[in-house]
Each structure stands twice: as structure tokens, then as C-alpha cells.
A protein has these predicted regions:
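Compositionally biased terminal segments of proteins
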Residues: 1-180
Length: 180
């Protein structure tokens, strides 16, 4: 895989996820970790975002999967948090380090297919860019501006095209002035 920005815990987790058919047929990796690890290598990212286009997220399936792999990953405790319908799992390892993993329904169809890591689909850089534009419009965070800057710099995407992609994907009016 070459140079990685993943922590050893993130890598171990994704190495197991990429071979689990019950997870890989439902979920894809997206967000800052996908962007940083598989496309740009520009920053560290702390969590793992696994999204599905299936309306019902099977909590039981996820919990069984996490418990089944607890000993392989040296997990001593799993905490679940639900905030505004978003489900996060906090994996607490025997060395007391933590990894946040989100398993969530994302109702917006992807623009194009991305890469694959084993059997795990990785969101395309174009989709991640459109998601970043939407996120900046709705709830800006510094890291999203940083990600968008590096996407545009390294991928020759133009802001107008990314705004159009976000408008189409999210059916939302977004203008340049709001993004700054």
C-alpha cells in the first residue's frame, strides 16, 4: 500500500473490514480518512466514516461484527453513541487508545465509483469533494477548507464544477459567496 496516513489501529480495522462481505456489500469508506489515505496523503484523520445507501442501518450486524473481531483488534470495550440519527462506535483498545467509527445511512447517491481496498469501496474523490463543498456550506470546519484546497490543487477541479456537483448531488442551492 506504500506510504500511509492511517494509524496502526485504523489500518488493522480496515484490513478486517475489507474482507468482510456483510460490511463491504453495504458500506463504503468516505470522508477525510478516505481522502487522505487513498487520494492525497495530505493530513492525518482520526475517525473512519462508513456510509451506506441502504435506508436501514443494521445495528445488530455491526455490533456482532465488532464483537466478533474484538480479540483480533485488542478491543476491551465498545461504546455506541447516537446523535441526530448518526451512529458512532467508539472502540476502546487494551492500551486505552480509541478509534471512532461511524456506520451511517447517507441518502445521496454517489456521482461516480471510486477505488477499492480489497472488497471495500472507497468513495470517489469527486464525491468527497462535492461532500466537502456541501459541508462547508452547511457547517464549515477548518479541515474541510483544507481538504477542498488540496483537492483543487492536486486534482485540477474547478470550484464552479464542484459547486455544480454538490448542487446536483444534494439538490441544494450553493453559491460561491457563501463558501468564503
Amino acid at each position: 500500500m506504500g506510504k500511509t496516513i492511517l494509524t496502526p489501529k485504523q489500518l488493522e480495522f480496515l484490513e478486517l473490514v475489507k474482507i468482510e462481505p456483510e460490511i463491504t456489500k453495504r458500506f463504503y469508506l468516505t470522508g477525510g480518512t478516505a481522502l487522505s489515505e487513498f487520494y492525497l496523503k495530505h493530513r492525518l484523520s482520526e475517525d473512519i466514516d462508513l456510509f451506506t445507501e441502504e435506508e436501514e442501518v443494521d445495528q445488530k450486524l455491526i455490533e456482532v461484527y465488532l464483537k466478533k473481531n474484538s480479540s483480533l483488534l485488542s478491543i476491551k470495550k465498545i461504546e455506541r453513541s447516537v446523535f441526530m440519527g448518526l451512529m458512532s462506535y467508539f472502540l476502546i483498545f487494551k492500551d486505552d487508545s480509541k478509534l471512532k467509527v461511524d456506520f451511517n445511512y447517507y441518502p445521496f447517491p454517489r456521482i461516480e465509483k471510486g477505488l477499492k481496498f480489497g472488497k471495500l469501496q472507497i468513495d470517489s474523490i469527486r464525491d468527497i469533494a462535492a461532500n466537502k463543498v456541501h459541508t462547508i456550506f452547511v457547517s464549515p470546519r477548518d479541515r474541510d477548507y483544507i481538504d477542498l484546497y488540496f483537492i483543487m490543487k492536486n486534482c485540477n477541479f474547478k470550484l464552479d464544477q464542484l459547486i455544480l456537483d454538490a448542487k446536483i448531488k444534494f439538490d441544494w442551492h450553493i453559491d460561491k459567496l457563501t463558501l468564503v
